């Protein structure tokens, strides 16, 4: 497993109030490479907090790639939250099977909405009050497989269903065969639930293996 220092979190952030803001284009960085290792789509940014603006010139140069070499937005380093560790662990399992190596590169995090709050209901209320950035076109066009869809039931509610389905169809087009082609037959387990609370359950193991083996009918052989 990794220590805190082995995972860096970089993101854009716009402060609204002392406790509220928009967080988007979040990257989990491991090792020395900046190659994209995959993408995850979730509900909304959680409890991870701003640490400081990124000042390292080499890091900033690497991050500009993720902005299409545009530098208008400030990059910040954030402290990780429990969900980020679960994303790390899920992709670590994936890459240990496919490459037999530790993570070395970037995992992209996308969301259905971008208000930062660990409590989804509060985040939804804030969206209603403050509005939110619509980054769906940008996000969908920047998905890189493997793509884990972990937005749970929020993706099936009326407000966010269209956005979730755009990510879903983009993932299918990118060759992700771990999802049922019928959108509504998928569970889309959130990584925190999958890797912590459901980790030792039969359905949790099946969901992990579906993603790792990229099939709806995984095997447990070997």
Where are these regions (language model features)?
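Conserved acidic residues
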Residues: 37, 105, 144-148
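Glycine/proline-rich loop-helix segments at beta-alpha junctions forming the active-site rim
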Residues: 116-222
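Catalytic metal-binding/acid-base residues of hydrolase active sites
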Residues: 44, 113, 154
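Residue-level detector of functionally special positions within alpha-helical transmembrane segments
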Residues: 42, 111, 190-193
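Short connector loops at secondary-structure junctions
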Residues: 101-121
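Surface-exposed cleft-lining segments at the edges of enzyme active sites
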Residues: 50, 67-80, 116-127, 154-155
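A short, N-terminal amphipathic alpha-helix
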Residues: 82-101
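Active-site and ligand/interface coordination hotspots across diverse enzymes
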Residues: 1-75, 220-222
């Amino acid at each position: 497993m990794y220590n805190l220092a082995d995972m860096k979190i970089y993101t854009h952030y716009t402060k609204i109030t002392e406790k509220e803001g928009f967080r988007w284009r979040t990257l989990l960085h491991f090792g020395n490479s900046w190659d994209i290792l995959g993408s995850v789509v979730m509900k909304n940014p959680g409890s991870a907090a701003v640490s400081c603006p990124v000042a390292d010139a080499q890091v900033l140069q690497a991050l500009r790639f993720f902005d299409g070499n545009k530098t208008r937005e400030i990059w910040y380093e954030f402290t990780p939250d429990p969900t980020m560790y679960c994303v790390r662990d899920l992709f670590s399992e994936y890459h240990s099977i496919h490459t037999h190596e530790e993570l070395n590169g970037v995992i992209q995090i996308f969301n259905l909405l971008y208000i930062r709050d660990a409590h989804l209901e509060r985040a939804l209320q804030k969206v209603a009050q403050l509005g939110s950035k619509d980054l769906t076109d940008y996000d969908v066009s920047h998905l890189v497989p493997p793509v884990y869809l972990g937005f749970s039931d929020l993706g099936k509610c009326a407000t966010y269903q269209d956005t979730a389905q755009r990510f879903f169809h983009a993932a299918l087009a990118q060759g992700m065969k771990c999802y049922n082609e019928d959108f509504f037959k998928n569970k889309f387990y959130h990584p925190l639930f999958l890797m912590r609370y459901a980790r030792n359950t039969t359905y949790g193991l099946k969901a992990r293996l579906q993603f790792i083996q990229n099939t709806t009918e995984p095997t447990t052989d070997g």
